[in-house]
A protein has these predicted regions:
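N-terminal export leaders
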Residues: 3-14
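Residue-level micro-sites within transmembrane alpha helices that shape
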Residues: 8-9, 110, 179
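Hydrophobic alpha-helical segments, especially transmembrane helices
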Residues: 10-11, 112, 205
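Short, motif-level signal for alpha-helix interfacial/capping segments enriched in acidic residues
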Residues: 17-21, 156-159
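Bacterial Sec-dependent signal peptides at the C-terminal "C-region" and cleavage site
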Residues: 18-31
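Serine-dependent carboxylesterase/thioesterase catalytic core
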Residues: 34-40, 46-47, 51, 55-68, ...
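Helical cap/lid subdomain of alpha/beta-hydrolase-fold lipid enzymes
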Residues: 115-227
């Protein structure tokens, strides 16, 4: 005949069950950050990233495009990073995690934001699309400060690299095309600590319009599939 456990034992069993339930609930997957900051490249406008922003919005995310002014490299990338900071302060609530996607020069401006103003606890995912992380030979054709920052071995590029270790919990992704004639060599768009992907997109400007690239971004930043 089974005996009813004493009240103290029943209480202990109930507490154990409650603790187990709490732990199991705590292991449920976290909802991915909803806010996505999109930073366009040199000579680009907010319209350049319209297709990507629309796809992210359709996936239930909240994209914000940061149109850089001026967008022609006339000022240094560290200065432009302040515009990214201002947009984040306006559109992303304090202490809320978010992701950043930078295209071309915008990827370097976004990295400068991380170095100067970013909080590692808030950056969930960093994606760069055809950004010259190791510089581009094309930058030798202009003496504009922002373009000089994109020259191989520039002081700017040397300054942003050492700060990457602070963002060890951030998911880093780079996407490039081996056919790029703006970022030379195209391998400059990779980072040693990132997951580096390559898609055969015909031209540098088409990277943010190509459906494969847009789908990759949505897949990485959007909510996980149900079931």
């Amino acid at each position: 005949m089974n005996r009813r456990p004493p009240s103290t034992k029943r209480a202990a069993l109930a507490a154990t069950a409650l603790t187990a339930g709490t732990l199991l609930a705590g292991t449920a997957p976290m909802e991915p950050p909803r806010h996505v900051i999109l930073v366009p490249g040199i000579w680009d406008t907010a319209g350049t990233l319209r297709k990507m922003a629309a796809a992210l919005r359709d996936a239930g995310l909240e994209p914000t495009v940061v149109p850089l002014t001026p967008n022609n490299g006339r000022i240094g990338l560290d200065v432009l990073a302040g515009q990214v900071r201002d947009a984040i302060e306006r559109h992303v609530p304090n202490d809320v995690r978010f992701s950043i996607v930078g295209f071309s020069m915008g990827g370097l401006v976004a990295r400068s934001y991380l170095r100067q103003f970013g909080d590692p606890a808030r950056i969930a995912t960093f994606v760069s699309i055809s950004s010259p992380h190791r510089g581009t030979w094309m930058a030798w054709f202009s003496a504009a400060p922002g373009v000089r920052d994109m020259r191989p071995d520039s002081a700017f590029l040397k300054a942003v690299d050492p700060d990457a270790h602070r963002y060890h919990a951030t998911k880093w992704i780079t996407i490039r095309t081996p056919l790029d004639l703006m970022i030379l060599p195209s391998s400059s768009s990779t980072l040693p600590w990132a997951r580096n992907e390559s898609l055969p997109v015909l031209m540098h400007p088409l990277m943010v319009l190509d459906g494969r690239v847009v789908r990759r971004i949505v897949h990485e930043l959007g909510p996980p599939p149900a079931g």
